[in-house]
Structures are given as structure tokens and as C-alpha cells.
């Protein structure tokens, strides 16, 4: 959603359940379970990097990062995103999920995620390891932001979105986690928040199917790694 605000575009949204089954969306995607999903005409993007590129189809370089920036993006999305769930107490996480999903929804969500992570290769951090990882990440952002308003330079960009997301999630679960963050990081978070979500319009599945029918195309060529 923040990418929409960054791009300053109008878009439409259909709400789906946090976990499968998701009815119509499952039928369209043929079983791919990741959300959010971006639709442009007949094309559906289930990878956030590809989705951001699709929003900027006239400039495919928007997600091309230097080696240091790519390492920071990978750190944010692979380690820190999961670490923020271990920084706060399990009771706080359950309370957050209950407010979002209801008690029955929490049971379904935990059962779904347990099944999904059964064959995962991620290293699960202890609470202390997670706290240390997040602290190091925040400190690194502070150093980066001392040189420019945004991680991407003078204006916010793809790298800012990637690093903002896990910290936003942490604040959604428990806003107290942000209390020890240095002011320079907190101010950056506020600037990112101020981007908003663009102009959100109502839409139905009928319109989504209409867009598919009106924008049929043939995909040619080889899909590049890692997609």
C-alpha cells in the first residue's frame, strides 16, 4: 500500500482472508498462497519486487540496487521481518492477532502457518538473538540515515519500502518496541508514514475479471532468475 502512496496513483483493493482458502483468488492464482497480490490487467504479481517493478514498468531500474543496498534489503526481508515477532512477548503477538482476526481466526492462522513452515529452511532466532538483530539493524539504519533523508537518497525508494516494512510490522504488534529507537530512525519512519496509500477506489471481483478479459496477452521469452 505504501508503494501506491510513493507512486501517487489511484488503485482498487479487494480484501481477502490472511490465510487460505481465499475462494476466487485461489482459483485465479492456481494455488499460490502469497499476499498481497498486484493485478494489472490480466497479469498478477505475487512477488513484491515484481509488483513494484510493474508499477514502474517504464523504468525497470527502480529495484536495481548496489551490492551494499541489496545486502541491506536481504537483511530486512529475510532476518529482521521474522525477528520482530520474537522481540515482543508471545502473549502480545497473540493479542495482536486476536484483535485482527478474532479468536477462531487466530486458531486457523496458527494452524496454517505451522503447516506452511513445516519444511521451511529459516533459522529461528531466540528472543535474545532477535532483539540483538533488530538493535543492530536499527543502528545500521541510523548510520545510513545520517547521510541522507532516505535510504534511497534524497527521495524515498524501493530500499526504503523494504526496510520500513518489518519495522512497521513491529510497531503494529507493540508500539513500545520503537521507544528506544534513535530519533533519526523514528523521524524516517514518520516520513515514510506520511507517504500514505494513494487514492483507494472500491472494486469487485466482476471488475477484476473484466480487466482480465480486456487485457489478454501472450507471454513470450524466458523468465529470469530468481522468478
Placement of each model-derived feature along the sequence:
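GST-like fold's C-terminal all-alpha helical module
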Residues: 80-194, 215-216, 221-226
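Cytosolic, positively charged, low-complexity intrinsically disordered regions immediately flanking transmembrane
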Residues: 193-214
Amino acid at each position: 500500500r505504501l508503494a501506491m502512496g510513493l507512486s501517487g496513483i489511484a488503485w482498487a483493493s479487494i480484501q481477502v482472508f490472511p490465510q487460505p482458502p481465499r475462494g476466487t483468488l485461489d482459483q485465479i492464482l492456481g494455488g499460490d498462497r502469497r499476499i498481497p497480490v498486484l493485478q494489472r490487467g490480466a497479469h498478477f504479481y505475487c512477488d513484491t519486487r515484481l509488483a513494484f517493478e510493474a508499477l514502474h514498468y517504464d523504468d525497470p531500474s527502480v529495484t536495481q540496487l548496489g551490492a551494499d543496498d541489496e545486502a541491506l534489503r536481504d537483511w530486512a526481508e529475510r532476518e529482521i521481518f521474522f525477528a520482530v515477532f520474537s522481540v515482543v512477548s508471545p502473549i502480545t503477538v497473540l493479542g495482536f492477532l486476536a484483535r485482527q482476526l478474532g479468536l477462531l481466526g487466530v486458531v486457523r492462522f496458527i494452524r496454517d502457518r505451522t503447516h506452511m513452515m513445516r519444511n521451511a529452511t529459516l533459522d529461528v532466532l531466540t528472543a535474545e538473538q532477535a532483539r540483538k538483530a533488530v538493535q543492530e539493524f536499527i543502528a545500521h539504519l541510523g548510520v545510513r540515515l545520517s547521510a541522507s533523508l532516505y535510504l534511497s537518497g534524497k527521495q524515498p525508494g524501493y530500499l526504503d519500502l523494504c526496510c520500513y516494512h518489518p519495522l512497521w510490522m513491529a510497531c503494529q504488534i507493540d508500539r513500545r518496541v520503537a521507544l528506544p529507537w534513535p530519533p533519526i530512525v523514528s523521524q524516517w519512519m514518520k516520513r515514510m508514514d506520511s507517504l500514505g496509500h494513494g487514492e483507494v477506489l472500491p472494486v469487485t471481483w466482476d471488475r477484476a475479471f473484466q480487466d482480465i478479459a480486456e487485457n489478454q496477452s501472450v507471454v513470450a521469452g524466458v523468465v529470469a532468475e530468481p522468478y
